[in-house]
């Protein structure tokens, strides 16, 4: 049976609507009928066919890894799922036999493959994943929100890596993940949450999500903002989401002694770092990859159930046949999350 899917067909800019064979299920898998997908920054990299994509993405391949759908098939060894369950899923498929997997640190598996990155993705009418990777969506959480659980998980993992209660938090990079991380920090009890960027549309989005200050570093100095807020000692926690060298070095300059930094943004390989700031301030820097399985997923659902409102981050919806308009919107930088509807 042929199904519709968005694929990377050629090693050049673009993504194409194609027909592919319906995926087949193994004993430990589930088959998901896709309802909604969201476009990730990674999908934009793949669309643009940048240096990272050229090294990473096999062609041709169905792409996409942010989704919600309904279980329509269950492998014979699978327990705990029923036909009709609403699910999203962890996009990192892990090996199960390395030291970290066997030690319960699955997100650090050295043999990880990625849905829509180096194995068949979710921009399709149907997706097969190991049942281990599926996450049931609690009642009361909308399909729209469930479809962005993957990037929301990046935000939660980054934000909750350090204690935030009563702390002053600096977030560099107001993309969707940075904005969601800011909302999480506020929700769990941080004092001042300051986010920086140069994109005024996204800074406005961050203001809607409740940050203390959204700072356009083209027109405003971070030091002046800290002074306005009565901060005399620097930020306690930094969340670096941009991969921008000047943003990271500005973060180092403005951290308090003993401050802690989570790094999610991917910098250029030749980024210069003022290590004196790190050493003499006694800073702790932690690299963040993916989501903790499945602690981050439980936290994500619980945060929404306890009143965290992420709805402003979803700014655009398109029918799947209008996928090109969705990608154009994401590439423009004038959007939050963009959702493609498959039904």
From Swiss-Prot:
Keywords of this entry: Cytoplasm, Metal-binding, NAD, Oxidoreductase, Zinc
Pathway where this protein functions: Amino-acid degradation; L-threonine degradation via oxydo-reductase pathway; glycine from L-threonine: step 1/2
Gene3D superfamilies to which the protein is assigned, alphabetical: Medium-chain alcohol dehydrogenases, catalytic domain, NAD(P)-binding Rossmann-like Domain
E.C. number(s) listed in UniProt: 1.1.1.103
SMART domains: PKS_ER
Active-site feature positions: 42, 45
Cofactor binding notes: Binds 2 Zn(2+) ions per subunit.
A GO biological process held by the record: L-threonine catabolic process to glycine
GO molecular function: L-threonine 3-dehydrogenase activity; zinc ion binding
Essential cofactor(s): Zn(2+)
Residues that hold NAD(+) according to the record: 177, 197, 202, 264-266, 288-289
Any one GO CC term of the record: cytoplasm
Subcellular location: Cytoplasm
Keyword Oxidoreductase: yes
NCBIfam families: PRK05396.1, tdh
Chain's role: Catalyzes the NAD(+)-dependent oxidation of L-threonine to 2-amino-3-ketobutyrate.
Family: Belongs to the zinc-containing alcohol dehydrogenase family.
UniProt protein name: L-threonine 3-dehydrogenase
Origin species: Aliivibrio salmonicida (strain LFI1238) (Vibrio salmonicida (strain LFI1238))
